[in-house]
């Protein structure tokens, strides 16, 4: 006989509160990696497209996540995650072949 799952602890935060916290976290990280005028233009585009709606919040979250993922994947020089590019050290111009 099927039973309802047991209580798994406290409920998650309300969706809108969690979403706004996620957006703030993404904005803080994006400002560290992209020019502010560029991010401002992105925000203006989202506002003009979606207005002041939850769809706009979800869209900018999705775009910032994608941009940051690609940025880290390519190899951000001050990244805490992602691929760390190892520079080949050349001493006195010599290289191994």
Curated annotation (Swiss-Prot):
Compartments it resides in: Virion; Host nucleus; Host extracellular space
Keywords: Activator, AIDS, Apoptosis, Cell cycle, Host G2/M cell cycle arrest by virus, Host nucleus, Host-virus interaction, Ion channel, Ion transport, Modulation of host cell cycle by virus, Phosphoprotein, Transcription, Transcription regulation, Transport, Viral penetration into host nucleus, Virion, Virus entry into host cell
Positions where Phosphoserine occurs in the chain: 79, 95, 97
Protein name in the entry: Protein Vpr
Chain segments carrying region Homooligomerization: 1-42
Its job: During virus replication, may deplete host UNG protein, and incude G2-M cell cycle arrest. Acts by targeting specific host proteins for degradation by the 26S proteasome, through association with the cellular CUL4A-DDB1 E3 ligase complex by direct interaction with host VPRPB/DCAF-1. Cell cycle arrest reportedly occurs within hours of infection and is not blocked by antiviral agents, suggesting that it is initiated by the VPR carried into the virion. Additionally, VPR induces apoptosis in a cell cycle dependent manner suggesting that these two effects are mechanistically linked. During virus entry, plays a role in the transport of the viral pre-integration (PIC) complex to the host nucleus. This function is crucial for viral infection of non-dividing macrophages. May act directly at the nuclear pore complex, by binding nucleoporins phenylalanine-glycine (FG)-repeat regions.
Gene designation per UniProt: vpr
Family stated for the protein in its record: Belongs to the HIV-1 VPR protein family.
Coiled coil: none
Comment field (misc): HIV-1 lineages are divided in three main groups, M (for Major), O (for Outlier), and N (for New, or Non-M, Non-O). The vast majority of strains found worldwide belong to the group M. Group O seems to be endemic to and largely confined to Cameroon and neighboring countries in West Central Africa, where these viruses represent a small minority of HIV-1 strains. The group N is represented by a limited number of isolates from Cameroonian persons. The group M is further subdivided in 9 clades or subtypes (A to D, F to H, J and K).
BP GO annotations: DNA-templated transcription; monoatomic ion transmembrane transport; protein homooligomerization; regulation of DNA-templated transcription; symbiont entry into host cell; symbiont-mediated activation of host apoptosis; symbiont-mediated arrest of host cell cycle during G2/M transition; viral penetration into host nucleus
